[in-house]
Amino acid sequence: MEGGLRTGRLPKAPELSLQSFPSEWSWVWTYPLFHKLAAFACHASQAWLTVGITSESREGPNGLLDTLASLYHTSSTSEQKQMTVLVHLADSDPTWLRRTIIRISSLYRSQILTGQLLLIHAPPDAYPAVNDAQNKVSRGQIYSKQNVDHAFLMSFATKLSTYFLLIEDNVFCAPNFVNHIRSKVGYRKPNTWVLLEFSNMGFLGKLLHSRDLPLLAHFLLLFHKERPLNWLLLHFRTLLGQQSSILCRPFLFYHRLTHLTFENKTLIGHEKDPPDPYTLSGTVYTDMRFSDTHSPQEAYTLDESFFWSYNVTTGNYLTVILNNPANLNRVQVRTGSITDGKYILEKGQVELGYDPEGTPPQCTSFTLLGRLVQGQMDQFILESIGYKVSCVKLAVNANQVGGLMIRHIYIWGENAKNRKDVQIDNDDDDDDDDYDDDS
């Protein structure tokens, strides 16, 4: 990247001070145990990194508790001294709020007392109104909630640290992630980047300068109904002069599989979680080298097993052939070691296949679902291409010397015979932004 980046490239924005907020900190609601905490946050010494999380109630396991456990268990004592964890409890249900706060305070009392863990909540009347002509939740309403939640989070985080890391409440972290991030930041001059990305999933693992947070919070509020958070983050980055994504390997943060993220529920047009992965029986075939120790079928399990190969070439494949055609709504592929990022499939793509013939069966037609980015893919599927799928194929797009680890191929869906005819709606033409790998 040539030269430095300046926030002055954007029109000057006022400090975040909504009329909804009578004073700077009055929008922060705290459970009685934390009344002193908000005051402490205004005067605490700066940390090097703030990890920001927005969370709300949902069915199933509490992903926030698992995420906090991962944050603290994978970071050393010295790393924790450099880090403040800021959690915005963005749900209006008082029962959930009290239960969550009491649970967190019992588990992380020492972190709370030392100011390493802060919990905040914005009351419902602080949110801007979003009108919808129909009696249903619109995309604008969901985008608005997501963006305003994070605007509040970033506004509070502005003076807590030098850098701000945005993650979600359903993730696990790589060991010593703070040191890894610090190392990557140390290689780059501060004025040569706006956004570093330690995950290729939505807004997960995005690192910003805390000095840019007031402007970003204002930007999110200006366009809170227009676009999802991940799109606005990339547009903000571009407006401040960083044209290409900077993907930092190895990736340090990955989604857990307990539930969908708030954003992706929106994109697939329903609110209920899909069935668990690997609910569909099938057989895995490959033309890659392998041993009995790590067989192809181990790429299609929910345990810690994996498929191992080496010296793959263009055109090699690993294909899951389903016993029955299925209606799929999501496919996730993970390659490489989670701890150090080695052995990923450097160039590959995932295809959906239809109309199998022969013995063993082979699909006679394929549709490209997407290409891997840094060896990973997690793609939601339009009904127009996810109907009666019989094959999920991972294809190699370039020769690759050395080892290849395929940790898993997860699919979500149901047997086609158990589902009524699909009505395809092609009216949704929202754009998706592509990533450029600049690392």
From Swiss-Prot:
EC code(s) of this entry: 2.4.1.-
This protein's UniProt keywords: Glycosyltransferase, Transferase
Tagged with keyword Signal: no
Xref: InterPro entries: Glyco_transf_54 (IPR006759), MGAT4_A/B/C_C (IPR056576)
Class of the enzyme per the UniProt entry, highest EC level: transferase
A molecular-function term among this protein's GO annotations: glycosyltransferase activity
Pathway(s): Protein modification; protein glycosylation
A single GO BP: protein glycosylation
Biological role: Glycosyltransferase-like protein that may participate in the transfer of N-acetylglucosamine (GlcNAc) to the core mannose residues of N-linked glycans.
Protein's name in the database: Alpha-1,3-mannosyl-glycoprotein 4-beta-N-acetylglucosaminyltransferase-like protein MGAT4E
